[in-house]
Amino acid sequence: MLLSLAIDTAFKGYLSLQNTIENDFELNGIAPLESATPTQISYIDQDKYLSNLTDSQAGAVFIRPHLLDKVPSHIQPLVVENPHLAFALLSQLFAAPCFTLTTQNPRTNNIQIGANVVIGDNVSIGEHSIIMPNVVIGDNVSIGEHCKIYPNVVIYRDSIIGNRVNIHAGSIIGCDGFGYAHTAEGKHIKIEHNGRVVIEDDVEIGANNTIDRAVFGQTLIKQGAKIDNLVQIGHNCVVGEHTLLVSQVGLAGSTTTGRNVIMGGQAGTGGHIHIGDFVQVAGRGAVGKNLPPHTKWGGHPLMELNEWMKFYVSLRRLIKKDSKKL
């Protein structure tokens, strides 16, 4: 595919190129600056990587406007406001097929279903979706169009999956939440969970996640949320639009987040807590209270991020000072 055509196709609705392509060539892939060839494209997003640009053999490179005069003459500059986004958009044109169907699926030519897939009663799967080997889909599940369900995923009954959803290998959608009542003698009596999980459009769920079904109603993952590997989401949680949950985040039951929340690795919440829009929680942050919108937090116990960083620096100084006395 010609470079110009690839950019027009990938950028539609997201970005615009701010300069003219003088050297149009047949593009065959993307690569880092260090290893890119003359038929590949790369990007540079920060000035500190300029040394890699000087020695690169890439055919073209996405750059910010202020770096235009730094591009060597043998590389076609591609000026955009967000090179990282440009690279991400173009990468979708060169994604390798994740699964090749070896036998014809009897249900429809537009759905690929791999070996050893188990599909329950009253299941609907949208066109162009891919169900990879060893997936289990329970009764009354709905899966939208252009979804990718990777090997060994289990989707429990009544779950609703939107369009363009990716669920990576080993994730469990809709298992029972952790809920028990307790007798006077100390026995734990299971509370049956009769709700469901709803995952809206354009969500990506990493490998080995667990998203628990609701006791009543639904556990909801809203549009555009991106969830890393090894994340636990408890019953009746609501994850807001375009939220990012990094690996090993844990949300206790009935936690709700606003839109565009970011939680770093191993951060966690207590139950029945609300995290406001655009909140950021640093890795291992322990959220035990509601957090207002547009704030940043960290630490255990949780405190505002600036205060936590000051506390951490002071603590290190104190430890260093005391160690000299030993």
UniProtKB/Swiss-Prot annotation:
Q: What does this chain do? A: Catalyzes the N-acylation of UDP-3-O-acylglucosamine using 3-hydroxyacyl-ACP as the acyl donor. Is involved in the biosynthesis of lipid A, a phosphorylated glycolipid that anchors the lipopolysaccharide to the outer membrane of the cell.
Keyword annotations from UniProtKB, A to Z: Acyltransferase, Lipid A biosynthesis, Lipid biosynthesis, Lipid metabolism, Repeat, Transferase
Under the GO molecular function aspect, what terms does this record hold?
A: N-acyltransferase activity
Pathway assignment reads: Bacterial outer membrane biogenesis; LPS lipid A biosynthesis
Q: Which residues constitute the catalytic centre?
A: 235
Q: Which GO terms describe its cellular component?
A: membrane
Q: Which reaction does it catalyse?
A: a UDP-3-O-[(3R)-3-hydroxyacyl]-alpha-D-glucosamine + a (3R)-hydroxyacyl-[ACP] = a UDP-2-N,3-O-bis[(3R)-3-hydroxyacyl]-alpha-D-glucosamine + holo-[ACP] + H(+)
- Protein name as catalogued: UDP-3-O-acylglucosamine N-acyltransferase
